[in-house]
Amino acid sequence: MKEELIDRLKRYAEIDTQSDPDSESTPSTEKQRDLLNLLKQELEELGLQTDIDDNGYLFATLESNIANEVPTVGFLAHVDTSHDFNASNVKPQIIENYDGKPIQLGDTDRELNQEVFPAMKSVEGHTLMITDGTSLLGADDKAGVAEIMTALTYLVEHPEVKHGRIRVAFTPDEEIGRGPHKFDVKRFDADFAYTMDGSQYGELQFESFNAAEATITCHGVNVHPGSAKDVMVNAIKLGERFDSMLPEDEVPEKTEGYEGFFHLMNFNGTTEKAQLKYIIRDHDRERFEARKACLLEIRDQINTVYNNDPVEVDMYDQYHNMAEKINEVPEVIEVPKRVFKKLGIEPNTEPIRGGTDGSQLSFMGLPTPNIFTGCDNFHGPFEYASIDVMERAVEVILGIAEEIAQPTDK
């Protein structure tokens, strides 16, 4: 299984599938179809029924091999890679039996070391796939793709392993927040699903942030600075004032666990007009709503000083905490917990300080927790995958399929 995972991840990683946040098409880049078409071919070679729609959502079915009816389970992974770093000409490297010492990344001056990345201590002795330092690896989420494909291959080649109906989806544009936007839950036709899009060994995630994005637009009055007294309103100064009125400790670099934050992503402008872009995050719905209200209150406080209401706030919700929906169907979490226990894996159920496709899918009627893939340091040249942990992820997929096929009278 290890060699199959290495081969799959390497082949998939070498295909450039970077998504583009500035594109309005779906998928946002045509090159994502290169991997989707390859996966369609590989799925059909396994004998699975497949279909891919115009938006690049590839669905496949492995039919049940048992007589009794059990829930249909889905497994999902996204094919696109992050736009935060170079994703072309990816050259995966293999490190056997990682000894814990610093690893130079190709001919660059970059290196993987445990002082900077202490989580690497947990993968000592493992086989790692890393980059050559010039690109990201794309294990987010091609490791998940490889794990699902490897598990399907095993089930096809081992019919003695009993399972119900399994649905698989490989999707575009997760990295730009649009993964589920055109996902047809009805067409997918599963009772619940799991995204294989987590990170470190043991992660079983069913709590995500509530998320919103806000654009603050400040309108100034620009006149000649020599005659500006009591006339000029500097939009940049308005933006600075707005940001200074937010709680200074409620920012990403000072929060953890269940603590939410305001994150100023971008600030640019001139005397005449300035814009600030924020993301707002909190696990608790009430605190989340209070954070959004805080932005509106600051707007109102500044606007009361001026006659022309120079500050505008445009805000929209991106996704909500999937725990609200997943907790309504506790078996969705109990199944993988039982599988983890059988496999000797201690589940890490800490909340995601982010979101997954499952965050949106759960509110679209498809409860979808997230499971580890064995990768870390996403979105940059320090990304790596533990092939050993990927093997365990495949075992989890197989275990879930078997667990669901068990009689329900236990």
From Swiss-Prot:
<comment type="function">
    <text>Cleaves the N-terminal amino acid of tripeptides.</text>
</comment>
<dbReference type="InterPro" id="IPR001261">
    <property type="entry name" value="ArgE/DapE_CS"/>
</dbReference>
<feature type="active site" description="Proton acceptor">
    <location>
        <position position="174"/>
    </location>
</feature>
<keyword id="KW-0645">Protease</keyword>
<feature type="binding site">
    <location>
        <position position="379"/>
    </location>
    <ligand>
        <name>Zn(2+) 2</name>
    </ligand>
</feature>
<dbReference type="InterPro" id="IPR011650">
    <property type="entry name" value="Peptidase_M20_dimer"/>
</dbReference>
<keyword id="KW-0482">Metalloprotease</keyword>
<dbReference type="GO" id="GO:0008237">
    <property type="term" value="F:metallopeptidase activity"/>
</dbReference>
<dbReference type="GO" id="GO:0006508">
    <property type="term" value="P:proteolysis"/>
</dbReference>
<feature type="binding site">
    <location>
        <position position="140"/>
    </location>
    <ligand>
        <name>Zn(2+) 2</name>
    </ligand>
</feature>
<keyword id="KW-0031">Aminopeptidase</keyword>
<feature type="binding site">
    <location>
        <position position="197"/>
    </location>
    <ligand>
        <name>Zn(2+) 1</name>
    </ligand>
</feature>
<feature type="active site">
    <location>
        <position position="80"/>
    </location>
</feature>
<dbReference type="InterPro" id="IPR010161">
    <property type="entry name" value="Peptidase_M20B"/>
</dbReference>
<keyword id="KW-0862">Zinc</keyword>
<dbReference type="GO" id="GO:0045148">
    <property type="term" value="F:tripeptide aminopeptidase activity"/>
</dbReference>
<keyword id="KW-0479">Metal-binding</keyword>
<feature type="binding site">
    <location>
        <position position="140"/>
    </location>
    <ligand>
        <name>Zn(2+) 1</name>
    </ligand>
</feature>
<dbReference type="InterPro" id="IPR002933">
    <property type="entry name" value="Peptidase_M20"/>
</dbReference>
<protein>
    <recommendedName>
        <fullName>Peptidase T</fullName>
        <ecNumber>3.4.11.4</ecNumber>
    </recommendedName>
</protein>
<feature type="region of interest" description="Disordered">
    <location>
        <begin position="11"/>
        <end position="30"/>
    </location>
</feature>
<dbReference type="InterPro" id="IPR036264">
    <property type="entry name" value="Bact_exopeptidase_dim_dom"/>
</dbReference>
<dbReference type="GO" id="GO:0008270">
    <property type="term" value="F:zinc ion binding"/>
</dbReference>
<comment type="similarity">
    <text>Belongs to the peptidase M20B family.</text>
</comment>
<dbReference type="Pfam" id="PF01546">
    <property type="entry name" value="Peptidase_M20"/>
</dbReference>
<feature type="binding site">
    <location>
        <position position="78"/>
    </location>
    <ligand>
        <name>Zn(2+) 1</name>
    </ligand>
</feature>
<dbReference type="Pfam" id="PF07687">
    <property type="entry name" value="M20_dimer"/>
</dbReference>
<dbReference type="GO" id="GO:0005829">
    <property type="term" value="C:cytosol"/>
</dbReference>
<keyword id="KW-0378">Hydrolase</keyword>
<feature type="binding site">
    <location>
        <position position="175"/>
    </location>
    <ligand>
        <name>Zn(2+) 2</name>
    </ligand>
</feature>
<dbReference type="GO" id="GO:0043171">
    <property type="term" value="P:peptide catabolic process"/>
</dbReference>
<keyword id="KW-0963">Cytoplasm</keyword>
